[in-house]
Amino acid sequence: MGEDKREIKDITDLPGVGPTTAQKLMEAGYTTLEAIAAATPQEVSQATGIPILTAQKIVDAAREALNIDFKTAYDLKIESMNIKKITTGSRNLDELLGGGIETKTITELFGEFGSGKTQICHQLSVNVQLPEDKGGLEGKAVYVDTEGTFRWERIEQMARGVGLDPDEVMKNIYWIRAINSHHQIAIVDKLFTMVKNDNIKLVVVDSVTSHFRAEFPGRENLAMRQQLLNRHLHQLMRLADIFNVAVVITNQVMARPDVFYGDPTQAVGGHVLGHAPGVRVYLKKSRGNKRIARVVDAPHLPEGETVFAITEWGIRDPE
C-alpha cells in the first residue's frame, strides 16, 4: 500500500482514471489530488458525469495517496506548530486575535457598513507580503470581490505605510469579481489548483453572503440558499486546512427585532455561517476613525474586545 501511495503523484495515476475520465475531471476543475480529496463523491459525480461509485473510488484513492486518515492528538499538536499568523497592523487587534489572523482556519469579520471589514481585508492583503519577522508570510493574496469594494488606491497607501513598493505589492494580489453565487463557488474550486502552485497565503472573500442573499430571497428559498452557502464554506475550510492558508470572509449584519437589551444585530447566514469560521470578530464604529473589535466565537480565544484605528496609512492602534 505504501508503494501505491508513492506512485500516485498526479490524477492520471489514480486507479480507474483513464484519459477520458482525467479529461472530465480537469474540465470540472479537479486538476490536483488535493482538489479531488477535498470534494465529496457526490460533488465529483455531479460536476463530471462520472458514476457515483467510480467517483467514490477516485476520491478514496486521492485521500489515501495524500494520507488523509486518523491522527493522534499529538499529531495535531505538531501540525498546530505549522500554523502561521498575519499581523493586522494594530497591536491591540493582534493581541485580541492571539497574535494575528491564523492560517488553516476561516476568520469572519462581520459588522455594519463602515465598521472596517474591507479596510482590514485590504491591510491583510498587503501585510501577508511582509517578511515573517515583520508579521507577514512572504506570500501572495487572492481577493474575491462580490460587491465592488476593492480599491487599488487604498492598497497603494497601505503598501507605503509598511515600507513596501506599491506596484510590487499590487502584482502579488490576485483580484477577481464574483458575479453571482455559482461563479463565487467556481472561483474557490479553481483556487485548489492556484493556491498550490503560486505561493498564495491569504484568500479573502468580501463579502461571503451578499450574492446568496440576493439570489435566494424569502423563506421559500432559504433551504437552497443555506445548502449552497454551506457547500461554499466547506470549500473554504478545506482550502485553508489542506494548504495552510489564511481565509478571511466578511459578512453583513441584520437587525434582530426580538432583542430589547444589548446589541440588536447579528451576522447574516444563520447557523450555517455560525459554525463554519474558526474565529468570528464583530466590528462596530466608535468615535472618529476608531473602531471596536470583539471576538464573539473562537474555541481557543477568550471573548474580549479592543479598539483600533483606520488611518491614512492603514489599520493601526489609536493614538
Swiss-Prot record:
Matching PROSITE patterns: RECA_2, RECA_3
Molecular function via GO: ATP binding; ATP hydrolysis activity; ATP-dependent DNA damage sensor activity; damaged DNA binding
GO biological process: DNA recombination; DNA repair
Binding of ATP, residues: 111-118
Keywords, sorted A to Z: ATP-binding, DNA damage, DNA recombination, DNA-binding, Nucleotide-binding
Family: Belongs to the eukaryotic RecA-like protein family.
Cited NCBIfam families: PRK04301.1, recomb_radA
Function: Involved in DNA repair and in homologous recombination. Binds and assemble on single-stranded DNA to form a nucleoprotein filament. Hydrolyzes ATP in a ssDNA-dependent manner and promotes DNA strand exchange between homologous DNA molecules.
Protein name (Swiss-Prot/TrEMBL): DNA repair and recombination protein RadA
